[in-house]
């Protein structure tokens, strides 16, 4: 593991004025933990074609193969899915744990739970070569196949780092999570889905994705994480330049992610501040009570690329989010047959509520979903009438 000693480089010139304190940060070491509850997820591409130059095990049936890619090993790691019987669900996996290019010398890993359509596997121990010795990591796989449909394999991180970290003079439990499941814990990117995560105990905003900074109890900290997750460095960020953001006054919570980090805001009369820089809207909420005092929440997620915005000094960013919302009705004709190419005599109706940036909207009454909208179909001459209720799914 290579210890970080260089000063953090900053992207936009003049975006923020920070004291040169990164070199003063000290490593705060964390412990590695293994869990059967996977963190993050990433789908692997399955193929029935054997990988070249990989020695394979003797299988009981036609196997599936997949390659897991990781910055920790440029060659990646291959795996083989097999059955304990000649037919049925795939329920054991051979994985190149050591990176020696062989699967025939590996012991297969079995399942922790399974049903008719899926199987979850025991954590697979992976070993990387590090500068200071071997580095251990764990992967969790879940195989899914519904009937004769397409087979899918999902990978999750089965290991994480945790420990007590000094944040502003107070020791707080911290966890580092490999959210993009590539074997490293320090990934930062413009797209939040490509970033790793950090969770701070007692933090009301929960897990955040990694950026240049973390905000804890209203204070900004420069953050640096070891590639293998073994330590974290935090340094109070001084003289952070902020810019104004405006949203409709009905917005009760707003979440954005950008080069600077992952931030949650509770707007006051539709206004709040963020460190200057580029961001993307991640979510928003509207809280409201009806005439009977029942609490309702309208929340948004899954924004398109138009949800990007810039925070600058002296130029407030105005975001048109919130109400009104749009109802989009999609009608499809399901297909059938072995190759799913035979038209049926049925129609499928899908109702989706969305916002201005293509975001999906969800409505909750307390902790429950309200009854779904009703759909009524009537023929032009009125001789046919059909009524049904949409279900969440």
Regions found by a protein language model. Give the residues of each.
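Hydrophobic h-region of N-terminal signal peptides that target proteins for export
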Residues: 13-23
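Calcium-binding acidic motifs and repeat modules
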Residues: 24-260, 266-380, 386-393
